[in-house]
């Protein structure tokens, strides 16, 4: 009883003190209880009726144990992927495919290089392209941000939206090309019997396999990529054995001069684009790894996971390309069905016949492993493009991306595959601009991960505006236009290199973007403070 009486006296004393404060103006009566109340109501309304109520599609995804998280930062409590191996195998499987194999064949078949020159270009430009992928993978571990959300910090909010749009186009476009190549290879199997797979059905098979994996999200993507390289690697070993038995491989003569230099630069641009193309995806595949994970192990795991399959498949592709130049029959298969035709020529007629066709099917299906990262990232890039689009669940965007890919790939394979290939080559140039801007921001201005306030990920008032990023992007685009060398456009500078020109579009685009960004960015910081 004495204790209760004492507490009551204290309460009365405190109430009297507050009343005197109000009378003397010590408390601000304009921003007291009412404001606190409305803030509490708004917070309650937001948490209860928006954040905590999953959408219809997210409820279905959750029931199927699929990933429901979108572009929101992954908190430390949600990080449950402690496998260093996952950081390597995601890229190991994605590049142990016929797409990378086909890129390697461009050296001898398109750019006129011999085998030795092709190998040197493959090694150097792959290393140049894979380092940014390994670097950006560290950001996912440290910050828990998706790659296109991370771009808001690295390139500015406005510029990041543009990169998100280009990334959506790139994800769909590359998957369309990959499906077209695989559908053509499937179509060649059992061609003489009249029971071969129609091209439309081949496109449907590849797209269907891709959506089955990407629908379930991060965990299933990593689980699939951990083992999908095994049959592909085995099929490539069979190609090596049959190529060796054929005796048609010859290294070719070493020739120098300006024309060869132009071929080296153009082939190098294709190789760089294949390796660096994963840079705008990288952080998406490490965001669930704990912050305490060794950054050195992550970096070198990604490097190894990219380097081996890229070196292996591209060098093998270059060897097969050299062999196709030495055999008119193989060359005719290439002219009709590109590198899928060369694979068929090596494995099937006068070779392994039925087993060779089985290997062709395996390699055609390998495209699923290459398309999976693109169709997972396309959903996140679409959400990062515009706030209302982020309200559409990831699983919906994943299915929409796969549907668009299928819808485009069927007519593209029949009618305009050449246009699609040229268009996607042009899209690839933006990678150098993106890397130049992002690396400038991190290493020159932020310098450490502590300079990133994760809570600002969707705050327009705190994120960099993107003035410097946009200026650098425009300048880089001019550099690309002057340096690119494609069948439909040869830049004024690139045409000066050799007889056919030399592609220096990514070198000029990246360097010009780097220069302009570091001229404008200090001014942006000075006048806007962010």
Curated annotation (Swiss-Prot):
Molecular function GO labels: nucleobase transmembrane transporter activity
Annotated membrane topology: Multi-pass membrane protein
Pfam families documented for this protein: Transp_cyt_pur
Localization terms from the record: Membrane
Cellular component annotations (GO), alphabetically ordered: cell periphery; fungal-type vacuole; plasma membrane
GO biological process: cytosine transport; purine-containing compound transmembrane transport
Superkingdom, natural source: Eukaryota
Protein's UniProt keywords contain Repeat: no
Keyword Membrane recorded: yes
Transmembrane parts of this sequence: 96-116, 119-139, 162-182, 197-217, 220-240, 263-283, 298-318, 345-365, 372-392, 396-416, 418-438, 463-483
Function text: Probable purine-cytosine permease.
This protein's name: Purine-cytosine permease FCY22
Organism: Saccharomyces cerevisiae (strain ATCC 204508 / S288c)
């Amino acid at each position: 009883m004495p204790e209760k009486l004492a507490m009551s006296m204290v309460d009365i004393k405190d109430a009297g003190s507050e009343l005197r404060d109000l009378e003397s103006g010590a408390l601000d009566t304009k921003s007291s209880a009412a404001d606190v109340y409305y803030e509490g109501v708004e917070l309650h309304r937001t948490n209860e009726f928006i954040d905590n109520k999953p959408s219809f599609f997210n409820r279905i995804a959750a029931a199927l144990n699929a990933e429901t998280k979108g572009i929101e930062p992954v908190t430390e409590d949600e990080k449950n992927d402690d496998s260093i191996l996952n950081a390597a195998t995601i890229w190991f499987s994605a590049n142990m495919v016929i797409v990378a194999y086909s890129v390697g064949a461009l050296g001898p078949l398109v750019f006129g290089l011999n085998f030795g020159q092709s190998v040197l270009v493959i090694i150097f430009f792959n290393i140049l392209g894979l380092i940014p992928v390994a670097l950006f993978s560290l950001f996912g571990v440290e910050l828990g941000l998706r790659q296109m959300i991370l771009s808001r910090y690295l390139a500015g909010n406005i510029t990041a939206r543009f990169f998100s749009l280009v990334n959506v186009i790139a994800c769909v476009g590359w998957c369309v090309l990959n499906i077209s190549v695989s559908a053509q290879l499937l179509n060649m199997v059992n061609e003489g019997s009249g029971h071969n797979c129609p091209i439309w059905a081949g496109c449907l098979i590849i797209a269907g396999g891709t959506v089955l994996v990407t629908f379930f999200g991060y965990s299933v993507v990593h689980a699939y990529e951990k083992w999908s390289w095994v049959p592909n690697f085995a099929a490539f070993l069979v190609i090596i054995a049959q190529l060796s038995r054929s005796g048609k491989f010859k290294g070719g003569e070493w020739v120098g001069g300006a024309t060869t230099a132009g071929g080296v630069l153009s082939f190098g641009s294709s190789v760089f684009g294949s390796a660096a193309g994963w840079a705008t995806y990288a952080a998406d595949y490490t965001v669930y790894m704990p912050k305490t994970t060794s950054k050195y192990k992550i970096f070198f795991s990604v490097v190894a996971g990219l380097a081996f399959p890229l070196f292996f498949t591209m060098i093998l592709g270059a060897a097969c390309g050299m062999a196709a130049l030495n055999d008119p029959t193989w060359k005719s298969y290439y002219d009709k069905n590109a590198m899928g035709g060369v694979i068929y020529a090596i494995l099937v007629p006068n070779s392994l016949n039925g087993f060779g066709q089985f290997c062709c099917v395996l390699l055609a299906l390998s495209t699923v492993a290459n398309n999976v990262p693109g169709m997972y990232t396309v959903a996140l890039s679409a959400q990062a493009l515009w706030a209302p689009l982020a309200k559409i669940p990831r699983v919906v965007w994943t299915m929409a991306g796969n549907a668009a890919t299928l819808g485009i790939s069927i007519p593209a394979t029949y009618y305009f595959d050449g246009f699609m290939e040229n268009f996607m080559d042009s899209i690839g140039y933006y990678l150098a601009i993106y890397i130049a801007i992002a690396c400038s921001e991190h290493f020159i201005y932020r310098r450490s991960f502590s300079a990133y306030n994760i809570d600002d990920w969707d705050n327009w008032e705190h994120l960099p505006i993107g003035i410097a990023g946009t200026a650098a992007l425009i300048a880089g685009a001019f550099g690309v236009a002057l340096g690119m060398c494609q069948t439909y456009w040869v830049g004024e500078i690139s045409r000066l290199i050799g007889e056919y020109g030399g592609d220096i579009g990514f070198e000029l685009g990246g360097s010009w973007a780097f220069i302009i960004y570091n001229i404008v960015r200090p001014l942006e910081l000075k006048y806007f403070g962010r």
